[in-house]
Amino acid sequence: AWEFFHPDEPVPALLQYVEDRDIWKWEFAQSAPFLSALDMEPKTFERWKEMTRFTPEQLDAFMARGAAMDEKFRKMAHDIAEGAQPLVFNGVAGLMVNAPGMFHSLVGDILSAKTGTFALMWSATDKGVKAGLRAQRNFDCIALAESMGGGGHAQACGFRMPVARLPELLTGV
């Protein structure tokens, strides 16, 4: 879209990095630190416009802040992933772990790389259970989500269910 509306301007780093995470390509080494800092910023057009015009010095400082946050986030994600348990979901073996929603993508990537199939991350509140499914590019987990009334994309999808069904999920069968 940027190229269409701004054909004579380079795509801002902010947009490149957001796309890099959104489609889980991770082509740019700077994406993770930049996005870790971005996640702490106000989600306003004014602030995002400022960030598209960062000087190289401002961008370096922003990235340094984000690099420290990304390192801590990755450490916490690996710690969460260590608590994973096996499960069989609709006849498919995978791994599951209790994880806050903000960790679903990274923990899911770590665990689905181990299984070769999928990872299921879940969290429960009084409103119900939120389950996120993640898979590597060689496995499509959308059918699993759809079987529970959910949806999403082939490698990132999810569903919700009542808390009363949590024991059924935790049996892993």
Predicted segments, located by residue:
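Short, small-residue alpha-helix embedded
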Residues: 1-4, 49, 160
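Short alpha-helices
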Residues: 1-44
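Short alpha-helical "patches" and their helix-cap loops
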Residues: 11-20, 49-54, 126-128
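Mixed-charge interfacial surface used for oligomerization/domain docking
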Residues: 27-114
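Gly/His-enriched, cation/cofactor- and phosphate-binding structural elements
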Residues: 75-173
